[in-house]
Amino acid sequence: MSDYKVNEATIAKKAELVDVYAQKMTEAASIVVADSRGLSVDEDTQLRKQLREAGVEFKVVKNSILRRAAEKAGLEGLSEAFSGPSAVAFSNEDVVAPAKVLADFAKDAENLEIKAGVIEGKVSSKEEIQAIASLPSRDGLLSMLLSVLQAPIRNVALAVKAVAEKEESAA
């Protein structure tokens, strides 16, 4: 028998963290796993600020806890992303926000690397996350949709106005 004794309080704390992160993974609209090793303190502070402003939660968590949480959340295939230092960005509302902020930041900070992610419960590769990052934000997409919906109404209104003006000038 070894002299090493496992601290039960530590095990309970880790189990609680696994539960917390499994729940976050289950509830999140999107998750992005990144390696932020090598970022300066200033860069890290800037990144966290941008993520917070976008409504994204950003945490650096031990890989063993993230692996267990991913298993518990039923996210098969995400565990491979948890090697080396891992930071995780969670968004419960905007699917695009974590990918967009991290990808935009990675353009200027070569030490930030996107590893993988989860979009609406589906494990996604680095390439898929970067493709999603190129999409407009939720607000941008809603704005585009509104423009598309308004165009036919605007055209009908202009046609009615033109007919009314034509009839006025004929009278």
Curated annotation (Swiss-Prot):
PROSITE patterns: RIBOSOMAL_L10 (PS01109). GO terms for cellular component: large ribosomal subunit. GO terms for molecular function: large ribosomal subunit rRNA binding; structural constituent of ribosome. Keywords: Ribonucleoprotein, Ribosomal protein, RNA-binding, rRNA-binding. The keyword Nucleus does not apply. InterPro entries: Ribosomal_uL10, Ribosomal_uL10-like_sf, Ribosomal_uL10_bac, Ribosomal_uL10_bac_type, Ribosomal_uL10_CS_bac. Pfam families: Ribosomal_L10. The keyword Electron transport does not apply. GO terms for biological process: translation. Forms part of the ribosomal stalk, playing a central role in the interaction of the ribosome with GTP-bound translation factors. Part of the ribosomal stalk of the 50S ribosomal subunit. The N-terminus interacts with L11 and the large rRNA to form the base of the stalk. The C-terminus forms an elongated spine to which L12 dimers bind in a sequential fashion forming a multimeric L10(L12)X complex. Belongs to the universal ribosomal protein uL10 family. This is Large ribosomal subunit protein uL10. It comes from Lactococcus lactis subsp. cremoris (strain MG1363). The gene is rplJ.
